[in-house]
């Protein structure tokens, strides 16, 4: 596999390789897109500005549908706990709980860092050129191509593609430089982990923050995850400390 054309610029400079797709961001969305495009026979390059999976970007509490996106043998490595329901609270953990549950598992808790790495590995095995430690510094949309200025430890290069997929998160450079509208709202989130194991099969949801919620997720031998998200301007740190202090 490889780019479909390369050559020499009229002024003697090197013409960058032309890919069908350049993917910016190799989280779950970017890795999945890169894999599907590569499997369909397209030439794909995917850039991750750091190391895939770090820093942790989101909770590991996911739908059981996730197993349709990874190899069959990945479940044993990724699965940390099975969830059968949730307890909703209008206050802290000492307030009344309103449980919702089923007799079969409704969601799973996984190793989120390893999920990202597994999905990126699938994209690589499908033929995508996955590059870590590559930061896209500029996106220049031309008539029939997109030119990306990409920096890495060896310097800066220009990569050309027919299309770019912006999978670079809530503060997306691709979105901003392409003139696409900003999200109506961004949330400020915080996560923390207690290493003490917890095999409970219910998550706790606290409706104590504006426009979103706080949570406690048992992760089996991996411990307990606490999290909270709220609009900017909300005292997220203070609210989060109250949550974790209440759980002791």
Residue ranges and their predicted role:
Residues 17-21:
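Extreme N-terminal starter segment of soluble prokaryotic enzymes
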Residues 26, 124-248:
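Predominantly flavin-linked oxidoreductase catalytic cores and closely associated redox partners
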Residues 33, 119, 145-148:
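Aromatic/hydrophobic pocket-lining residues that form π-stacking "cages" and hydrophobic walls in ligand
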Residues 40-42, 122, 126:
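Conserved dinucleotide-binding and phosphotransfer motif residues
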């Amino acid at each position: 596999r490889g780019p479909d054309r390369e050559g020499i610029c009229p002024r003697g400079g090197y013409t960058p390789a032309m890919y069908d797709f350049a993917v910016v961001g190799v989280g779950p969305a970017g890795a999945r897109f890169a894999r599907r495009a590569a499997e369909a026979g397209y030439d794909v390059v995917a850039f991750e500005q750091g190391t895939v999976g770090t820093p942790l970007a989101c909770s590991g509490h996911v739908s059981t549908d996730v197993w349709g996106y990874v190899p069959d043998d990945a479940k044993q490595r990724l699965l940390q706990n099975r969830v059968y329901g949730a307890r909703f609270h209008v206050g802290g953990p000492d307030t009344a709980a309103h449980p919702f549950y089923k007799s079969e598992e409704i969601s799973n808790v996984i190793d989120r860092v390893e999920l990202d790495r597994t999905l990126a590995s699938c994209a690589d095995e499908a033929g995508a050129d996955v590059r870590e430690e590559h930061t896209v510094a500029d996106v220049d949309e031309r008539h029939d191509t997109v030119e990306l200025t990409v920096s890495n430890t060896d310097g800066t290069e220009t990569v050309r593609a027919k299309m770019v997929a912006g999978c670079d998160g809530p503060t997306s450079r691709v979105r901003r430089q392409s003139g696409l509208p900003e999200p109506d709202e961004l949330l400020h989130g915080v996560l923390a982990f207690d290493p003490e194991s917890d095999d409970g099969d219910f998550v706790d949801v606290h409706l104590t923050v504006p426009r979103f919620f706080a949570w406690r997720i048992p992760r089996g031998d991996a411990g307990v995850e606490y999290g909270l998200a709220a609009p900017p301007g909300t005292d997220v740190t203070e609210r989060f400390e109250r949550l974790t202090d209440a759980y002791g």
